[in-house]
Amino acid sequence: MVDSIKDRHTITSIEQDSLKSWLRLILLFTIGVVGTVGMWSVVVVMPAIETEFNIDRGKASLLYATTMVGFGLGNFLIGKVIDRFGLKIPIIFATIILVSSYLAAIISTEFWHLLILQIFMGTAAATFFGPAMADIGNFFEKRRGLAVAIIASANYVAGAFWPLLISSFLELNNWKEVYFIIAIICATIMFPISYFLKNNVANNISGNDIATKNTSLNNLSPSTLQILLILAGIGCCLAMAMPQVHIVALCVERGFGLGIGAQVLSVMLFSGM
C-alpha cells in the first residue's frame, strides 16, 4: 500500500506555480481556517467552563496548555505520517478526530475529560498547519514564500473569524450546544474538501535542489536553522500566552462582556496576518 501511494507513476503530477497549484493552496487554506478552530474555541468558552466546573482561571487555562501539547506532537507525528502516506488520509483522519472530540466534549462530565479531548483537538489542528505548509511548498518555486505564508496565515484567519462566530453562538446557546454546532460545521466543510485533495506530486522539484538553495542562508546547517526556529517559536508563544489565552476571560471579568473579548482577540489575530 505504501509503495503504491509513493509511486510517482500512479499519482497525478502538478506543475509548480500552475493553476492546479493555486487551487491546492486554496483548498489547504480553507481547510486550515476551519480545522484550526480547535485552538481558538476553548479560549472563548473558557469563562463558561470555569463556571460549570467551578474552577479558577489557572486550572481552566490548562485546557489551552493541553491543546498546545497536542499541537506540538501533531505537527511532528502527523508530519511523519504524511511523509509516508501522503496528505489525503491524514487530513481525513484528523477531521474525524476533530469532529469526534467536539462531540465527546458535549457528554463530558469531568474537567479532566476536556483536558484529554483538547490534546486530540490540538493534534488534529496541527495537521492543517506545519504539514500543510510543508506540502504546499513543494508545488511552488517562484511564489513559494507567498504560498507558505498564505497557508501559515490560515491559523490567524481562524483566530480572527472563529471567536466572533463562537461568541455570537454563545449569546443564544450554552457552550456544549456551540461545540455541537462547530462539529457540524467542520464535518460539512472539511470532509468534502478532503475528497478533492489528492496525493499529488510536483514536477521539476528535487530534494537536492531545495537543499542547495537553503544552504545559502548564512551557511547555517538545516539542524541549526531548525533549532533557531524552534527557539523563536517558543519565545513567540511565551509572549502571546496572556493576550492569546486570557484576553476573553479577562474582558468578561472586567465587565466588558464576552462579545468585546472576542472582538479584541479577533483584532489581535487579524493583525497577525
Feature names for model-found ranges:
Residues W40, T67-F76, G159-A160, L269-M273:
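Residue-level signature of mid-helix packing/kink "hotspots" within the transmembrane helices
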Residues V42-I49, P222-M273:
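Extracytoplasmic gate region of multi-pass secondary transporters
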Residues V33, S101, W112-T127, I234:
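Hydrophobic core of transmembrane alpha-helices in multi-pass small-molecule transporters
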Residues I150-V201:
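Helix-loop-helix hairpin linking two adjacent transmembrane segments in secondary transporters
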Residues S18-S41, I119, P222-M240:
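Pair of pore-lining "gating" transmembrane helices in MFS-fold secondary transporters
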Residues L73-W112:
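Conserved MFS/SLC helix-loop-helix module at the cytosolic interface between two early adjacent transmembrane helices
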Residues L23-R57, N75-I78, W162-P163, P243-V248:
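Extracytoplasmic
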Residues T127-F140:
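Intracellular juxtamembrane helix-capping segments at the cytosolic ends
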